[in-house]
Amino acid sequence: MSEQVERDSMDFDVVIVGAGPSGLSAACRLMQQANESGQELSVCVVEKGSEVGAHILSGAVLEPRALQELFPDWQERGAPLTTPATRDELYLLKDAKKAQKLPNALVPKSMHNTGGELTRYVISAGNLCRWLAEQAEELGVEVFPGFAAQEVIHDADGTVRGILIGDMGVSADGTPKDGYMPGMELRAKYTLFAEGARGHLGKGLISRFQLDEGKDPQHYCIGLKELWDIPAEKHEPGLVLHGSGWPLAKDTHGGWFLYHAENNQVVVGLI
């Protein structure tokens, strides 16, 4: 990227990269604490997706403990938690036609999604993020969807000073096209990276500061997910199924999930 390009710059107290659950929750909590203490705080959340939630692909079963701490009145605020988990089963698939249900007594407590102190919910993680973004903006957070963070801004001594938004109107070979617009610098006293498990800025920071030195290597899997519309007579809102085995090979780590959400929809995924 050319050093001669003249770029606009905006300054914030905190810049957060990624409008997922962690980034938006952090933004909300920062503004809550600032408002409670009467301090002025400028917080910006940058999201590469065209809208918040556009890149949040997973369906999920949520235990709302952290949400309860962040917004004790989340129900009154209209949080999209409308389908409580009602039945929870774990299976081992032997082939395309045979499955063995594991007895509940053999399932670790941490893997149970019904019963317990708090009701769990089958949710759309994308809808939850959109709702969190609304709460963040009400608190005074600036949320910028459609802007991908391209580089980390460092001082000469390596200190992180913010991020550089990617240029717009650039051809495949990197040359400017009609409508070219240089990316803006978002500078901050603190920069929080909430890109997810394998964000490209995070990878650069891990390498630069040797954050993985002496640590176990990360383990990654490919996940596939689909959203099915099924007949109402086959739909059981709140049914939560997990399992492993077929179609994965015996020496392959992974498993599958199947959640009955609202509106006769089923979230199914293979990892």
Language model: regions and residue ranges:
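Conserved internal helical-beta-strand scaffold that buttresses enzyme catalytic cores
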Residues: 212-214, 241-243, 261-268
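Flavin-dependent oxidoreductases
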Residues: 204, 208, 225-252
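Short, well-ordered coil/turn residues at beta-beta hairpins
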Residues: 18, 166, 194-195
